[in-house]
Amino acid sequence: MEQKLLDSKTIFKLKILEELSEHDVVELDDLAGKLGLPGAEIALIVDELKNNYLIRVENSNVTWLPGDNPARIKPWGWNYVYRPLVGSTMHVARRLSPWSIVVSEYQLHGYGRHGKEWISDLGGLWITFKFSLEERIAQYLPVALPVILCEFLREKYGVDAKIKWPNDIIVGGRKLVGVIIEGEYFRNRLHVYIGIGVNVNNDPKLERAVSLKQILGRMTPRNRIIAYFSGVMGRIEKYLEDHGKLQARYLELLETLGRRVAALILGDGVIIGKVSGVTETGDIILDTGTEKLKLSSTEIYELRYL
């Protein structure tokens, strides 16, 4: 794994967030003393944090609004872990029991499908859920999760969210949410890991990405999102019952449907065709003109529009 180093300013921002997560109010002078920086420099760093977090400064007192501070939420029925800095929330979750949540402000080694780098800017929401499911139910997660995420964004924020196969959530052609699904067998059940990255109040570095802040023109308290996701994941088996209905809604939201694409196959070249459908378990159906192929997200490294 390539070593990733933090710049000094990001380190101090994370230290400040750690202090604010543990206290209702922190004085600028106290932060300067604890971090060993001049007060003026601390004030500048806090001012920068205000661009990505719901942080207020009044009379030299710094507060992080509880609705945006992940340390202030305790989802019922979950083992909840908040750590400002981690290698990967997925890796932390692997050492925890099922029905655990891991939230972080920054991941040094966040990753998506096939190990691709997952950029975790400050101000976003980087979260992993670990729970236990029967395999026959778990197979419908790749279709259910994008639908659940799209519906949430549409209903709560009025965002025209759509799905880019297999499970990216896009707005105006730019990525707003990414999802990774992993699992491991334990006896007759699966331990499922759902990693979700939401560009909330961060400023994405990639032009093909977008944040809620950029779309709405305002900051969004992240704990509302954590609370909703926690509630849904706690009842996930109920959501997966009507997988036929989920598949139909997935296809309605699928921006990839009907497009001509190039599918980069792991170790086997490129397949060009038109996306004609998706199965109940999330496999894509490509019409090459001579045949229809069913391909899974584990087989396709990347899907490019033509």
Show where each model-derived region lies.
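N-terminal lobe of the biotin/lipoate ligase/transferase fold
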Residues: E2-R154, T220
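Conserved RNA-binding domains used in RNP assembly and mRNA/RNA metabolism
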Residues: L17, R259-L306
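General small-molecule cofactor/ligand-binding pocket signal
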Residues: V81-R83, K162, S296
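A generic structural motif
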Residues: E105-Q107, I170, E182, A262-L266, ...
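Conserved, helical-rich catalytic subdomain that frames metal- and/or nucleotide-binding sites
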Residues: I215-I271, S276, Y305-L306
